[in-house]
């Protein structure tokens, strides 16, 4: 896949992730939309393949960070937040054992 196609794919992926992560939060959706568009417009005339590759890596890292680390909180009271995790962030409880396993 050529670099222009990769750039367009990353642009679309970032916007899809933005819509999932900030669902029902108009202010965050708009701020993320503006920031994504601003960063892509700022670098639209970049021609160096190395620089483009570096920026693609940064964009992919940002998308991964948004998808795996951001969780929404809703103000329910003066000093209370209700966390609203997405289903893809929830994991099953895994038993933890801090005793080392013995090999025979």
Curated annotation (Swiss-Prot):
GO terms for biological process: cellular respiration; mitochondrial respiratory chain complex III assembly. Belongs to the complex I LYR family. Assembly factor required for Rieske Fe-S protein UQCRFS1 incorporation into the cytochrome b-c1 (CIII) complex. Functions as a chaperone, binding to this subunit within the mitochondrial matrix and stabilizing it prior to its translocation and insertion into the late CIII dimeric intermediate within the mitochondrial inner membrane. Interacts with UQCRFS1. It comes from Rattus norvegicus. It is found in: Mitochondrion matrix. Its main location: mitochondrion. GO terms for molecular function: protein folding chaperone. It comes from the Eukaryota. Keywords: Chaperone, Mitochondrion, Phosphoprotein. One of its GO terms (cellular component) is mitochondrial membrane. This is Complex III assembly factor LYRM7. The modification Phosphoserine is found at residue 60.
């Amino acid at each position: 896949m050529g670099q222009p196609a990769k750039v367009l794919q990353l642009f679309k992926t970032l916007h899809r992730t933005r819509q999932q992560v900030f669902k029902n939060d108009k202010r965050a959706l708009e701020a993320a939309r503006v920031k994504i568009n601003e960063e892509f417009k700022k670098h639209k005339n970049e021609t160096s393949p190395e620089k483009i590759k570096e920026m693609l890596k940064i964009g992919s890292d940002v998308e991964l960070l948004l998808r795996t680390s951001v969780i929404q909180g809703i103000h329910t009271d003066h000093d209370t937040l209700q966390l609203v995790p997405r289903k893809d962030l929830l994991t099953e409880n895994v038993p933890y054992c801090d005793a080392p396993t013995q090999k025979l």
